[in-house]
């Protein structure tokens, strides 16, 4: 690998370590010419499928766009950034597991709604109202009835207090 300091192509690996999950390899390198050290990271580069929009247009999958739309739905809700990141990771893993080169945007939307429903019911309703393009209050009421009809699992009567400063946009 080429030295970022002097450009010499003959660098040497001084140390190699894997992260805990074995997903990333960290290498400490040394340049024999300028004697400077630097770190490189090696990770698997998986190709996310392209997204086919409702109008037929195709676009590349964008992690930041997915996370941003979920973050918007979760605005001022007691959900941590870690929980959001984990949900985005699960969606990406499901998309990769499909093994398809192209995935309809509807599939992505359904995966997002499924994850938001697990994270926060209000965020789920917010996202669903935009995603499903609710035309009137009756459609909101129907989704609220659907959410209320589902059994609650060990849910406290009051929303939990934020446990860290990573609670999204809590004010």
From Swiss-Prot:
Pfam families: ATP-cone, Zn_ribbon_NrdR. Residues 148-171 are annotated as: Disordered. This is Transcriptional repressor NrdR. The lineage of its organism: Bacteria, Pseudomonadati, Pseudomonadota, Betaproteobacteria, Rhodocyclales. It comes from the Bacteria. Negatively regulates transcription of bacterial ribonucleotide reductase nrd genes and operons by binding to NrdR-boxes. GO terms for biological process: negative regulation of DNA-templated transcription. Belongs to the NrdR family. PANTHER family: TRANSCRIPTIONAL REPRESSOR NRDR. InterPro entries: ATP-cone_dom (IPR005144), NrdR-like_N (IPR055173), RNR_NrdR-like (IPR003796). Residues 49-139 form the ATP-cone domain. Coiled coil: none annotated. A zinc finger (unnamed) spans 3-34. Keywords: ATP-binding, DNA-binding, Metal-binding, Nucleotide-binding, Repressor, Transcription, Transcription regulation, Zinc, Zinc-finger. One of its GO terms (molecular function) is ATP binding. Binds 1 zinc ion. Its cofactor is Zn(2+). It comes from Aromatoleum aromaticum (strain DSM 19018 / LMG 30748 / EbN1) (Azoarcus sp. (strain EbN1)).
């Amino acid at each position: 690998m080429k030295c970022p300091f002097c450009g010499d192509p003959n660098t040497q690996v001084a140390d190699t370590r894997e992260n805990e999950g074995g997903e990333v390899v960290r290498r400490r390198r040394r340049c024999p010419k300028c004697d400077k050290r630097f770190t490189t990271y090696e990770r698997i580069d998986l190709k996310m499928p392209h997204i086919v929009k409702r109008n037929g247009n195709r676009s590349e999958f964008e992690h930041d766009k997915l996370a941003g739309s979920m973050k918007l739905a979760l605005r001022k809700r007691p959900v941590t950034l870690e929980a959001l990141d984990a949900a985005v990771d699960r969606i990406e893993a499901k998309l990769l597991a499909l093994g398809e080169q192209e995935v309809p945007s509807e599939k992505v939307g359904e995966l997002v709604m499924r994850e938001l429903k697990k994270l926060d019911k209000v965020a789920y309703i917010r996202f669903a109202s935009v995603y499903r393009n609710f035309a009137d209050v009756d459609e909101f009421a129907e989704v609220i009835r659907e959410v209320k009809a589902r059994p609650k699992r060990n849910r406290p009567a009051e929303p939990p207090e934020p446990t860290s400063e990573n609670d999204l946009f809590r004010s």
